[in-house]
A protein has these predicted regions:
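GHKL (Bergerat-fold) ATPase N-terminal catalytic module, capturing the glycine-rich phosphate-binding loop
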Residues: 1-98, 102-103, 111
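GHKL/Bergerat-fold ATPase module in large chromosome/replication-associated machines
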Residues: 36, 54-77, 97-100, 107-191
Length: 191
């Protein structure tokens, strides 16, 4: 990734509800309001549900950037300091709570990613074996395609994979409209 400066860490990680959030939301909704998830760090803070402590090591792509180490236990305090990092990017280290160790098991992680991140627009990789595995999610799901570009077999495969049903659906309706609101999806009718 492009990493963050200390100021960006303060703004986007430390201050979830920074003073301009309401103004930003209002402007964002006027501009279409798509993709608001991920803009306030709420997803990041949900990591504290299973972690007792989280560290961020980051270095911005900007010229003369220095590394930043941020750490917090999720309460009201945190530490932030410079650190030595050779490359730009961000690494997040979650120290999993003792009673949440099941979330360190490959099968559990894989299952959660496939269930909750199946159609994220960015590829998600899980590397337990030391080699590059294929992405666990589909960054271009079938419902984003134009109906004319989809085959019957693709519709059936997507249904079986998404709904874990080995039967073919009875029929389906591919929704792709822009007015009076934007809607893309596939409505399946099981047998």
């Amino acid at each position: 990734g492009i990493g963050m400066t200390e100021e960006e860490v303060e703004k986007y990680i430390t201050q979830i509800a920074f003073s301009g959030a309401a103004d930003f939301l209002e402007k964002y909704e006027k501009a279409g309001g798509e993709g608001i998830i991920g803009h306030f760090g709420l997803g990041f803070y949900s990591a504290y549900m299973v972690s007792e402590n989280i560290e961020i090591f980051t270095k911005s792509y900007r010229e003369n950037a220095v590394g930043v180490h941020w750490e917090s236990d999720g309460e009201s305090t945190y530490t932030i300091e410079e650190c030595d990092l050779a490359n730009r990017g961000t690494r997040i280290v979650m120290h999993i709570a003792k009673d949440e160790k099941e979330f360190l098991e490959e099968g559990v992680i894989r299952s959660l990613i496939e269930k909750y991140c199946a159609f994220m627009p960015y590829p998600i990789y899980l590397n337990f074996t030391g080699k590059d595995d294929k992405a666990l999610n589909d960054t271009q799901p079938l419902y984003l395609k134009a109906p004319k570009d989809c085959t019957e077999e693709e519709y059936k495969d997507f249904y079986r994979k998404t709904f874990h049903d080995y039967h073919d659906p009875l029929f389906w309706i591919h929704l792709n409209m822009d007015y009076p609101f934007r809607l893309k999806g596939i409505l399946y009718f099981p047998k």
